[in-house]
């Protein structure tokens, strides 16, 4: 027995497009009819007359064939339009009877378990902070959590059934002063398959220097077997901003970790920290990226930027997530970049996040994640950020991650930056076969000492050592990084330039 799956709206759209194509071709044929079917002879001789008659005959034959094709095209469009209407009518006619059948199927499960077999969970009402309802036991998405009242948390998203996606968490309630509500957690994905729900955003707080923003809700975990984790919620804006929520973990067999939520913007105390990325599926899956740290804008005082979130760990076969960038400190220090996530067995480590620019001290770059135990390259360290002015201090670059034991190159160290130049990060160590990572360059000082270059990572068996990072210029210059030792079959890395 064969089955047909169709979408009436798509069929109707295709029929409309085909009708437009037919109209365009018909217009072109009509415009070409007169000049091509009445070709004049080039001269009065018999050959010219015969050639003109030949070309005119071909054009007349084409016009006759085009008329037949236009008729067929019109009939086809009519049939397609009628089919779309028939499918739509059949859907409308069957909706009410099937809904009654579904109610009969769900009634015993609702009576015994308070949950249907098939169907989506109800959404929480806005402003109540009510949790979203769970989806059907067999098939169904979880309902979204309701947003919180003023200063109250948002509701959690409902969990899915065997198949389905988790519901999103509700947003925390905003307040004019005081502490805002935190975001609700996202619901878990289906037991067999489904994505976790996103965490709700933290509430915003006013009230000048005393307001505290709500933290973003954590993302829901992916399905137990397959599914991506939900993203963490964004932290709320306030004088003391809320942190971003952590991303949910991926499914057991396969799934990508959810991204961490961004930290909220801080207006006086500090920017919120970025949420950590969720871990990838235990077997296959990449770790989620860390959330970006919130900026410190300091309308009323000083406020450093928030640190970036760490990247999630990869699965047995998967890469680590990148660390989040640190927040900018407009009147304060920049936030540190988050560290990259490490892989477990076979895969590359995640890159470290860049530090946030600061008006005083720049944020340090995050360390690169380590590669899988056997095979993979270490993640690159994040770049340190610029510190403001001649008295500022640049952030140090993050260290590169270590490679896998058997194969892989070490990660490169991050670059430092000035005021007083930040030091370059160390290059990561290589595996048995692979090159060491290069050290990061030191930052140039602005009326201050330059940053030292990072040392190159060493190789073990087959591979070259990483080059040392160049010294940053300044008063005085920084020291150059030393090259890493080469393997038994390899060269030593070059020292950095002074």
UniProtKB/Swiss-Prot annotation:
Q: So which domain of life are we looking at?
A: Bacteria
User: What triggers production of this protein?
Assistant: Constitutively expressed in vitro, suggesting that it could be an essential gene. Expression is regulated by SigA. Down-regulated during stationary phase, under nutrient starvation and oxygen depletion.
Disulfide bonds, paired cysteine numbers: none
Region spans: Interacts with TLR2: 140-260
GO molecular function terms attached to this record: host cell surface receptor binding
Cited Pfam families:
PE, PGRS
Recount the biotech application: PE domain induces protective cellular immune response and PGRS domain induces humoral immune response during infection in mice, suggesting that this protein is a promising candidate for the development of M.tuberculosis vaccines. Immunization of mice with the PE_PGRS33 protein stimulated CD4(+) and CD8(+) T-cell proliferation as well as IFN-gamma secretion, supporting the potential use of PE_PGRS33 as a vaccine candidate for tuberculosis.
Essential for translocation to the cell surface, as annotated region: 1-30
- Activity regulation, short description: Binding of Ca(2+) to PE_PGRS33 induces conformational changes and increases affinity for TLR2.
**Its GO CC terms?**
cell outer membrane; cell surface; extracellular region; peptidoglycan-based cell wall
Please name the InterPro entries in this protein's record: PE-PGRS_N (IPR000084), PGRS_rpt (IPR048996)
Q: Where is the PE domain?
A: 1-93
Compartmental location: Secreted, Cell wall; Cell surface; Cell outer membrane
Gene deletion effect: Deletion mutant is strongly impaired in its ability to enter macrophages. Deletion does not affect the intracellular growth in macrophages.
* Keywords, ordered alphabetically: Calcium, Cell outer membrane, Cell wall, Membrane, Secreted, Virulence
Question: GO biological process: any one?
Answer: response to oxygen levels
Entry domain remark: Contains an N-terminal PE domain, followed by a conserved linker region and a C-terminal PGRS domain. The PE domain is responsible for the export and localization to the cell wall. The PGRS domain is required for TNF-alpha secretion and is responsible for the main immunomodulatory properties of the protein. Variations within the PGRS domain alter the levels of TNF-alpha induction and are likely to have an impact on the innate immune response. PGRS domain is also required to mediate cell entry into macrophages.
Its family? Answer: Belongs to the mycobacterial PE family. PGRS subfamily.
Chain's role: Induces TNF-alpha release through human Toll-like receptor 2 (TLR2) signaling pathway, leading to macrophage apoptosis. The signaling pathway involves TLR2-dependent activation of the mitogen-activated protein kinase kinase kinase 5 (ASK1), which activates the p38 and JNK MAPKs, leading to enhanced expression of TNF-alpha and tumor necrosis factor receptor superfamily member 1A (TNFRI) genes. Signals are amplified through classical caspase 8-dependent mitochondrial release of cytochrome c, leading to the activation of caspases 9 and 3.
Additional record remark? Expression of this gene in M.smegmatis leads to low levels of NO and IL-12, increased level of IL-10 and better survival of recombinant strains in macrophages.
Q: How does it assemble?
A: Interacts with human TLR2.
Q: What is this protein called?
A: PE-PGRS family protein PE_PGRS33
* Source organism per UniProt: Mycobacterium tuberculosis (strain ATCC 25618 / H37Rv)
Which gene is the coding source of this polypeptide chain? PE_PGRS33
């Amino acid at each position: 027995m064969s089955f047909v799956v169709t979408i009436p709206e798509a069929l109707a759209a295709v029929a409309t497009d085909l009708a437009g194509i037919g109209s365009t071709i018909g217009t072109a044929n009509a415009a070409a009819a007169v000049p091509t079917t009445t070709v004049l002879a080039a001269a009065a001789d018999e050959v010219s007359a015969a050639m003109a008659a030949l070309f005119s005959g071909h054009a007349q034959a084409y016009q006759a064939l085009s008329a037949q094709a236009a008729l067929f095209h019109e009939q086809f469009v009519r049939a397609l339009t009628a089919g779309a209407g028939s499918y739509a009518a059949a859907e409308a006619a069957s909706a009410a009877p099937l809904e009654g059948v579904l109610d009969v199927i769900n009634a015993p499960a609702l009576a015994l378990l308070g949950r249907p077999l098939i169907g989506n969970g109800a959404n929480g009402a806005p402003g109540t902070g009510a949790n979203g309802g769970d989806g059907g036991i067999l098939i169904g998405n979880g309902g979204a959590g309701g947003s919180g009242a003023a200063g109250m948390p948002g509701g959690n998203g409902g969990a899915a059934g065997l198949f389905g996606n988790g519901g999103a968490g509700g947003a925390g309630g905003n307040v004019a002063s005081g502490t805002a509500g935190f975001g609700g957690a996202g619901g878990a994905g289906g037991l067999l398959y489904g994505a976790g729900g996103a965490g709700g955003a933290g509430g915003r707080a006013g009230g000048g220097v005393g307001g505290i923003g709500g933290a973003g809700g954590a993302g829901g975990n992916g399905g137990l077997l397959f599914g991506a984790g939900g993203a963490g919620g964004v932290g709320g804006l306030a004088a003391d901003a809320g942190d971003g929520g952590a991303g949910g973990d991926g499914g057991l067999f396969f799934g990508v970790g959810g991204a961490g939520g961004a930290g909220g913007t801080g207006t006086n105390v500090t920017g919120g920290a970025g949420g950590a990325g969720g871990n990838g599926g235990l077997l296959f899956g990449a770790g989620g990226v860390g959330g970006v740290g919130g900026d410190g804008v300091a309308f009323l005082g000083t406020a450093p930027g928030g640190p970036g979130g760490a990247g999630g760990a990869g699965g047995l076969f998967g890469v680590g997530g990148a660390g989040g960038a640190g927040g900018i400190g407009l009147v304060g220090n920049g936030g540190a970049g988050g560290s990259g996530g490490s892989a477990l067995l076979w895969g590359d480590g995640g890159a470290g996040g860049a530090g946030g620019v600061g008006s005083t001290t720049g944020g340090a770059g995050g360390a690169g994640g380590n590669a899988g135990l056997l095979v993979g390259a270490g993640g690159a360290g994040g770049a340190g950020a610029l510190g403001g002015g001649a008295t500022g201090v640049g952030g140090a670059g993050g260290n590169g991650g270590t490679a896998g034991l058997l194969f892989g190159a070490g990660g490169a160290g991050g670059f430092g930056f000035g005021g007083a130049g930040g030091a370059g990060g160390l290059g990561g160590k290589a595996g048995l076969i692979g090159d060491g990572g290069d050290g990061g360059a030191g930052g140039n000082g602005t009326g201050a000492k330059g940053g030292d270059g990072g040392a190159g990572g060493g190789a073990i068996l087959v591979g070259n050592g990483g080059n040392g990072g160049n010294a940053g210029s300044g008063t005085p210059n920084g020291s150059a990084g030393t090259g890493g030792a080469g393997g038994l079959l390899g060269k030593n890395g070059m020292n950095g330039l002074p």
